[in-house]
Amino acid sequence: MEKLTKIKHRIIPAKDSQNNSYKKVLKIKGLERGFGNTLAVALRRILLSNITGIAPFCVRIEGVEHEFTALEKVSEDIVTILSNLKKVVLNYDEDYVKDNQIIKLSLNANEDNRITSNHLTVTNAPRVEVQNKDVEIATLSKPGVLKLEMFLRAGRGYVDFEDNKKFIEEKEKELKELSSLSKGAFIAMDSVFSPVVNVAWKVTELNTASLKIEEQLELELETKLGVTPESAIKLACKILVAHFQTIGDLTDLDSDEIFQSEKQSLEKEEDDMEIRLLNLSMRSQNALAKSGIKTLNELASYPIEKLKEIKNLGEKSREEIIRKLNEYGKLKN
């Protein structure tokens, strides 16, 4: 077997990072031709959909039965408060949080005026921390009028509020035992578990005058507070290696950290990636969502010629969608 060129890699700050340690570029040199895109696509998919994180799945507010309401002496309505809570970034230690464990955060605000994420307190789990403590949640004109609890769990990818409603029904007894509030509904929220905000890549050819052309891969990665790009890349590589070990050497694999047991629910196939993870423009995402297209598979099965019939989907958006389908090998000729 002919040996491959030894590759070199390093991780450097992104050009526009402005000293942001959560935005980095992984550079890999000396790749055989074609390996740049091969590695980039695999790493990007793992980074966006398979890195574990922690996120809220529901909120309970004293005296509130649904999100389309308002509280006296509180400037913001409930929808706005929920939107603000989604901006709170949390970090946790996997060794201290069990699978399907429900974590509770309570809002402790005995003053009026501006209430922020600094007023949130974790009540039942060690090593869970609020990373951005300056997120504005609500403005009160009277102390103590907003009593709130936020419930979180660990997971991967994205879970919409409809699926979280089912989870709330399953865990209703446990939630009521955890809650300290006397009344109020458990209001479901979308959960964005992935700590990875964005992944982009660029492949350039090196020594093009030579008979043996090599490639350089630049993978730009941005993560949320508390999870460094380096740790996210390390975990993504670990997941990929475990899969390749399974295929190539079944006898020497210790895969308990990566794979679920056969009794556990299987994750959605990668082809059923949520539309929001494709990095389409917000206009394209909204238009597709209103047409009932939620996954990559559903988009791929939709006739290209019928895209023009989708409301608010212009020519540029259609071109963007076609490029994205081609990128994932889903474009039908």
From Swiss-Prot:
It comes from the Bacteria. Gene3D superfamilies: 5' to 3' exonuclease, C-terminal subdomain, DNA-directed RNA polymerase, insert domain, RNA polymerase, RBP11-like subunit. Disulfide bonds: none annotated. Keywords: DNA-directed RNA polymerase, Nucleotidyltransferase, Transcription, Transferase. The keyword Protein transport does not apply. GO terms for biological process: DNA-templated transcription. Its EC number is 2.7.7.6. Belongs to the RNA polymerase alpha chain family. This is DNA-directed RNA polymerase subunit alpha. It comes from Mycoplasmopsis synoviae (strain 53).
